[in-house]
Amino acid sequence: MAFANSILDALKDTLVVTAFGGAEQIPYLTVYAVLPMSLLFVSLFTKLSQRWGREKLFYAAIGTFISFFVLFTIVLYPMRSVLHPVDLSVQLLKWLPSGLRGGIAVFTNWTYSLFYVFSELWGDVVLSLLFWGLANETTSLHDAAIIYPLLGIGANVAQASSGFMMKWVTGSGNFISWDAKLRFLMTVVLTCGGCATLIHAYICDK
């Protein structure tokens, strides 16, 4: 999960910063998209956890993320030139104050904006709520002193490993298109999500 989170962090920033509007979008995304969605997700998570239970909620939550990332990789990203209303945004920039440029860019690059939000929520929901919720439930107080530091070390190793892999993929030369690199990286993310689901099912069945 930490391995996938590091990849998503790098991809979301790359897509947003290099798109129409550039880095001006990030404050708008953080305040007006990520924060409200985080609060909504946590509220929904709290309510559903009382009705569904942790195991069912885990599959529902991670299934939502995997479904969106599949949709983005197969449909939204390849069709971005059609889906992004760049011409309309150029006109809006002429009519609206220049201070709203970042907000207009968020609207223009709405597929990237969704990807940014889901990538941020992956760390907040999948790592913070789902993973640590499972760890707290399956780890005894006696074992926690040994296992929790190992989990922290594992997360750091995963982040470092993902950095090396990202460097290898992005530096693989001009003969591989950026679209192909993104598909490869998203395939890795989806594989991590699938493996996490299988491991979770194995732990719950024991």
Which residues make up each language-model segment?
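Residue-level hotspots within transmembrane alpha-helices of multi-pass secondary transporters
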Residues: 39-44, 160, 164
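Helix-loop boundary and gating motifs at the non-cytosolic
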Residues: 1-38, 120, 126, 130-133, ...
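Helix-to-coil boundary motifs at intracellular loop junctions of multi-pass secondary transporters
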Residues: 19, 51, 134-138
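Cytoplasmic helix-loop-helix junction between adjacent transmembrane helices
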Residues: 125-151
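Intracellular loop-helix junctions on the cytosolic face of multi-pass helical membrane proteins
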Residues: 23, 50-56, 63, 74-113, ...
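Structural signature of transmembrane alpha-helices in multi-pass secondary transporters
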Residues: 33-34, 151-155
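A generic, lipid-embedded transmembrane alpha helix
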Residues: 34-38, 64-75
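Short alpha-helical transmembrane interface motifs in multi-pass membrane proteins
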Residues: 29, 112-116
